Amino acid sequence: MSKQEIEAVVPAGEGERWSLYDEWHDPFEHKNGPILCRDLEGDAASVTTPLEFGFRSQDDHCNVAGAVHGGWLLTFADVCMANSALRCLTLASPAPQPGQGTPSLCTISLHMDFADRVGPGKWVTCAPEVYKRTKTHLFVRSLGKQGDRVLFSASASYRSFLIQAML
């Protein structure tokens, strides 16, 4: 996604801070996005540095009532929270040894409360917080917003595991 395309999607004046989030090249996220991401504290990648994700709602995201479909908002929240948890996991853990596998997560539970509706053409954001980590689980919460309006609150737990290379 070019700088001009990003600037056309994000709120005015914020284009240079956002980039396409496609770190894992997930075809589902790519087809339903684009999902953009920014580091809320500059370029320093650390476990405590929060990420914010955003998307511009489109007609394809909406149901017959003209509101962004709750299923898409739930998916967006899961993508945002899982990727924040995975960042926390990979930055806080030592690099895997050869043959050990690649760190990954699976969603164990996901809960969302819808607070307001949003229509097409709106900028929607989600800034997850990893609030607890155990040896095998990460717990994350977030609010989805359009500006200052809260659209949803979400929470999730994820189990960490290593993906073994396919031979």
Regions found by a protein language model. Name each.
Residues 1-167:
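Terminal targeting signals and extreme-terminal segments of soluble enzymes
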